[in-house]
Regions:
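Structural signature of tandem-repeat unit edges
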Residues: 1-123, 127-147, 151-168, 172-202
Length: 202
């Protein structure tokens, strides 16, 4: 273990950090806000299974340049307030450069995801998100998507329709057992990297 790392308290939260990079977080019960003041927040998605469901506001300090956290860690974030030039204010965690969605957080089952707010989607950005609707399906067709962007999300839990699962105009999954897959006529973006035995365009 790196001896330069130690636990530091910021508000009602504790951060395991060397002053530059934070690799672990603890949050006191009933805490509503979390402040990211360190340049880098790097929480390993594979190792960290912590969930801080009471936190609703994320405050980002001006020195923050990189935030990597599991989407399921802070499921109930409702507002991101950023003093950093690297991130924007809003209801999702979005990098300013390139408009990349990092975390959409939990969202309710009846929430509509606003795809007009970002141009790219990072890996696992939707993991644990319960939403299954988009606010305007036409705005999903020109978005660059990283691998596993919708992994573990409500969108992926939906049943196949004509052998596919769609998020707006994005085809995000294909039924590999289907004898025939029918793609929409227009305005689609094919995302999953799967072999399809038979595909028909109406």
């Amino acid at each position: 273990m790196n001896n330069d790392y130690k636990w530091e308290t910021v508000g009602r939260c504790k951060f395991y950090t060397d002053g530059t990079t934070c690799t672990d977080i603890e949050v006191m019960d009933d805490t509503k806000e979390i402040s990211f003041i360190y340049p880098k927040i790097m929480i390993d998605r594979e190792k960290c299974k912590k969930v801080f469901s009471s936190v609703e506001i994320m405050l980002i300090g001006r020195n923050a340049i990189s935030i990597v956290i599991p989407n399921k860690m802070l499921p109930n974030i409702k507002h991101v307030e950023s003093k950093s030039s690297s991130f924007i204010n809003g209801k999702y965690l979005i990098e300013r450069a390139g408009g990349k969605l990092l975390n959409v957080f939990g969202q309710s089952e009846d929430a509509e995801i606003d795809f007009t707010l970002f141009n790219r989607i990072g890996s696992y950005a939707f993991e644990g998100c319960r939403a299954t609707k988009v606010s305007d399906s036409e705005d999903t067709g020109f978005i660059r998507i990283n691998n596993n962007a919708f992994f573990g999300s409500g969108f992926m839990n939906q049943p196949f329709v004509n052998g596919i699962k769609c998020v707006g105009s994005l085809v995000v999954d294909v039924d590999e057992t289907a004898d025939e897959v029918i793609m929409p006529k227009t305005g689609i973006q094919y995302f999953p990297d799967k072999f399809v035995k038979c595909m028909r365009l109406p």
